[in-house]
Amino acid sequence: LGKYSSIIIFDPVPAKMRDYCKISKELKSDGSNVAGVLCALAPEEKKKVEALVSSYVRPLSERDINKVISEPVSLIKSDAMLYCYEDWNPEQPVDARGMSDGTLRFIAIVVALLAVAPHSLLLIEEVDNGLHPSRAKELVDMLKDLSRQRQVDVLCTTHNPVLLDELGNKMIPFVSYVTRDENGDSHVNLLEEKENLTKLMASGTIGRMMVNDKI
């Protein structure tokens, strides 16, 4: 762990993201001030980051979101709110209160990957929580893409077999699973070291192994 410049535990809470938040340069661990972090950026940088966030969210949503922005609110412009624009009503912005939990968590994770320092370790529990299973590919692609660009390692937990399947066999060396012994103690195991892994993989995917209680 000494190789990392920082270790961040990130667990975005959509309910908190729907409130107004203070404009701030530091992202909170619950993602509640995503809008404030975006608003704290210099104008040109803000446009670039919002465009990048939008590009990852665009293929994600069933509501056809084409743009995600953050804007200051109140008379003194000290607070911020997250907004999106949808294809079916492009002139009418929708604030965070009208966005789904899955979309808000996804936005928060994108912003977190852009906000943390290079060579950090970002830990995200139940990374796909609130996201429709059909969007697992978009989530995996985003995590791979941004972590590579930003030189950030990402450690995620999930109970979703669809997400595990989307990882593909090339990611097996990076997958671990947790078991309990007869004393109730938990143990983290590398998937690639599992006995009879080749035989198990011949009869199904990683997700199927999980569903069948093989891992």
Where are the predicted features?
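Phosphate-coordinating catalytic segments in nucleotide- and nucleic-acid-processing enzymes
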Residues: 1-117, 207-215
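Walker B catalytic acidic pair
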Residues: 125-126
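Alpha-helical structural signal
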Residues: 100-103, 136, 160
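Motif I (Walker A/P-loop) of helicase-class P-loop NTPases
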Residues: 108, 136-139
